Amino acid sequence: MKIELFNDNFQNFKRYGIPKAQLVIADIPYNLGNNAYASNPMWYVDGDNKNGESKKAGKAFFNSDYNFNIAEYFHFCNRLLKKEAKERGQAPCMIIFCSYQQQPMVIEYAKKHGFKNYIPITFNKNYSAQVLKANMRIVGATEYALVLYREKLPKFNNNKKMIFDHFEWKRDNKNLVPNIHPTQKPVSVLKRLIEIFTDEGDVVIDPVAGSGSTLRAAMELGRSAYGFEIDRKMYALAKEKMLSDVKIQTNLLEFAK
C-alpha cells in the first residue's frame, strides 16, 4: 500500500510513474466564483452581519476555481483510470462531486471522453451552510455526485445487500479528522464510496485532492492512493495535518504482512 500527494497539476501525472486507478474520485470546483461564501455566515466577521463583511466576502474558495477546465479534466482522468476489464465485475469508474446545476454539463463532457454511462447519487445532510437564508427560503442540505463508467458496470461490493442511491452525510469527528478545506468531504463518506467500488489493494486517485481526505480514506481502508494539489498552502496543510500519520499506519500494515 502506498499513499502519495503531489504538489503538481494532475496533467503531469506521467512524470511520477503512478499506477492506473480502479477508482478516480474528485470534487470539482462548483463555479461559484466570487459567491463561494454567499448565504454562509463566514461572509461576515464572526458570522454576524452587524460586524461587517469578512475577508472572505466576494471571494472564491481558491484562485484555481476560476480557470478549471472540465474538458481537460476528463481527458486526463480517462488516462488515469485502468482500461476496461475483460472479466465481469472488474471495470473501473469515476466519481465526481458537483452541484446539482452542473450535472448535465458533467454528463455531456463525460460522454465525449468515453464515459457513456452514469449513476446519480445524493447525500443527505442534517444541517445547511445557507444559514443566512434560513428565514427567507428552503435551504440546501444535499450534496450531489455522479458515478461515471465506460461500458461495463464497475466493480461493486454490496455484500449481497441493496445499496440505495442516497447516502447519509455523516460529519467527521473534529478530534480525529482535521477540517482544513472549505469544501472538504467527510472521510466517512469517502470511505463508504471507496469500499463499494474497490477492493483492498486497489488504487484510488484524486486529481484535485485539496485537503487529502480522499487519500486518508483510502489509506484507512488499505487502498493505495495518489493525489494532486496545485495550491502550495493547501498541499502543506494536507501533508502536515491530514496525512501526517500515513507512514506510521502504512508501516504497521506492511509489518503485519
Task: Identify the function of each model-found stretch.
Residues 1-228, 233-236:
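Core catalytic lobe of class I
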Residues 1-14, 239-257:
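S-adenosyl-L-methionine
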